[in-house]
UniProtKB/Swiss-Prot annotation:
Pfam families: Pept_tRNA_hydro (PF01195). Belongs to the PTH family. Disulfide bonds: none annotated. The keyword RNA-binding applies. TRNA binds at Y15, F66, N68, N114. Hydrolyzes ribosome-free peptidyl-tRNAs (with 1 or more amino acids incorporated), which drop off the ribosome during protein synthesis, or as a result of ribosome stalling. It is an enzyme of class 3 (hydrolase). One of its GO terms (cellular component) is cytoplasm. This is Peptidyl-tRNA hydrolase. GO terms for molecular function: peptidyl-tRNA hydrolase activity; tRNA binding. CDD domains: PTH. The active site is at H20 (proton acceptor). Keywords: Cytoplasm, Hydrolase, RNA-binding, tRNA-binding. The gene is pth.
Length: 191
């Protein structure tokens, strides 16, 4: 069986470590202890890495389409590698959750997230596994755009590193058990 773990974000160094790039950060954390090197594939508009875990080929994906067009890369890669939607997990930021909280879902609307809107539009379904990482709402007069494209406050940095470790543990648990439902029950709502 082949699986695909996708972290959403925006390409380019100016977006490194921004809240909107928590998906990229999570994928980078997951592969940190594996033998994975990313290569940019311009045909698929993504950085792609892979490894074998428990005898299964796992693709780690960071779309380079910019957030709002993430569905283009996701659909192309699922089709090319003949991966079922049920064997894919999308990791992304969520404004409506407190900073550092993680939530697992097997289906649902985009909730205003343009990357998820794009994936739903290109796949034609809302039924795919996902891990949402809370980035909180902007304070005061800050716009949503400035908030999601901003970096985490110093106070939140250690919490985010711990959260990324939890996402890593959860994805590894999923890859061991091959059971997203069980993973949800074990890790949902952690902070």
């Amino acid at each position: 069986m082949v699986k695909m773990i996708v972290g959403l974000g925006n390409p380019g160094s100016k977006y490194n470590d921004t809240k909107h790039n928590i998906g990229f950060m999570a994928v980078d954390r997951i592969v940190k202890d594996l033998d994975v090197n990313f290569t940019e594939d311009k045909n698929f508009k993504a950085e792609i890495g892979s490894d074998f875990i428990n005898g299964e080929k796992i693709y780690f994906i960071k779309p380079t389409t910019f957030m709002n067009n993430s569905g283009i890369a996701v659909k192309a890669l699922l089709t090319y590698y003949n991966i079922s939607i049920k064997d894919m997990i999308i990791i992304y930021d969520d404004l409506d959750m407190e900073v550092g909280k993680i939530r697992f879902r097997q289906k649902g609307s985009a909730g205003g997230h343009n990357g998820i809107k794009s994936i739903i539009a290109h796949l034609g379904t809302q039924e795919f596994d996902r891990i949402k990482v809370g980035i909180g709402r902007p304070n005061g007069r800050m716009t949503v755009i400035n908030h999601v494209l901003g970096k985490f406050d110093k106070n939140d940095e250690i919490m985010i590193l711990n959260t990324l470790d939890k996402v890593d543990n959860a994805v590894n648990y999923y890859l061991q058990t091959n059971d997203f439902q069980k993973t949800m029950q074990k890790y949902n709502g952690l902070k």
